[in-house]
Amino acid sequence: QRQMCIRDRTYAVQGEFAEIKWPDAEVYYVRTGIGKVKAAFHLAEAIRQVEPDIVINMGTAGTIHHKVGDIFVCRHFIDRDMQKLAGLGLSYQLDTSALLEQKGFCKHWTESATCNTGDSFLTELTDIEGDVVDMEAYAQAFVCNSKEIPFISVKYVSDVIGQNSVKHWEDKLADARTGLSHFFNVLKESI
């Protein structure tokens, strides 16, 4: 068992914070704020200061196809804002699996889901690609990929899009903290 310095575990709002208690890891927490720009900026600053071995994004997400309380381990990311410009040849997808594998992280985390990220909080059903939707993960994956730092995102489904999403998100933050804490401290216990 190796000693490692995770150092960056990101979350958007205080209500999503859940402590990770892994004996073989030093964890540094970064509250990035909501949205792609804030998430990218605050993560880049933290990376510059602490040079982490891996970045784990933890938080809530909406869904169309799954149920509240489900937890997804995301390795594939879509920027739904850039996806609209795909016809112009712009990239809008990232997969972080190769770097995780190359650096030896999350080998026993067999789950693999897709997170769809955009600048708006989705409240109405729309045609989106992916298992969950959020407002930060793609931007963080982009920053990490650019700096060759492994990245993974763990999302707790707090709301089903189109079913009073904003209200459900606010009401489910405590459940999300409990679910994410159980995921990291009981189910996974290490990276």
Say what each PLM segment does.
Residues A18-I191:
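Glycine-rich phosphate- or other oxyanion-binding loops that anchor nucleotides, phosphorylated ligands
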